[in-house]
Amino acid sequence: MTMSPCPLLLVFVLGLVVIPPTLAQNERYEKFLRQHYDAKPNGRDDRYCESMMKERKLTSPCKDVNTFIHGTKKNIRAICGKKGSPYGENFRISNSPFQITTCTHSGASPRPPCGYRAFKDFRYIVIACEDGWPVHFDESFISP
């Protein structure tokens, strides 16, 4: 008895439809981590910002503002669940404050070398989540 290629083709096509969102989501989460996660910061001063922005490839062109969250991946991800609350449309706010460093571009030109000023804070953070994973940090939120 020979098996028709149709069931195998169907499984393959369904796999293509189901897998890409997972890959795209993983890429967005990895980008979020690259841009905004630093578990153990060293210094948290202007040199820290200049070094981290360059290391994370956020200087071509010079990014105006970027915030690094200093915590565990587990605690940041938990904001997408029970450790966060709905905030506006499609965002979640952390139930607890996080240590953060915000790097603000201080140069006149958007071209490297990029100069940055560091601002250290301990505040609530707002992120967007997809299927329980952080994918975007809201730079515009400043906690009271």
From Swiss-Prot:
Disulfide bonds join 49-103, 62-114, 80-129. It comes from the Eukaryota. Its EC number is 3.1.27.-. It is found in: Secreted; Cytoplasmic vesicle, Secretory vesicle lumen; Nucleus, Nucleolus. GO terms for cellular component: extracellular space; nucleolus; secretory granule. Keywords: Angiogenesis, Antibiotic, Antimicrobial, Cytoplasmic vesicle, Disulfide bond, Endonuclease, Hydrolase, Nuclease, Nucleus, Secreted, Signal. GO terms for biological process: angiogenesis; antibacterial humoral response; defense response to bacterium; positive regulation of cell population proliferation; response to bacterium; RNA catabolic process. It is an enzyme of class 3 (hydrolase). Coiled coil: none annotated. Detected in small intestine, caecum and colon, with the highest expression in Paneth cells in the intestinal epithelium. Changing residue 83 to N: Loss of angiogenic activity. No effect on ribonuclease activity. The active site is at residues 36, 136. It holds the Pfam family RnaseA. Belongs to the pancreatic ribonuclease family. Has bactericidal activity against E.faecalis and L.monocytogenes, but not against L.innocua and E.coli. Promotes angiogenesis (in vitro). Has low ribonuclease activity (in vitro). Promotes proliferation of melanoma cells, but not of endothelial cells or fibroblasts (in vitro). PANTHER family: ANGIOGENIN (PTHR11437:SF60), RIBONUCLEASE (PTHR11437). This is Angiogenin-4. It comes from Mus musculus (Mouse).
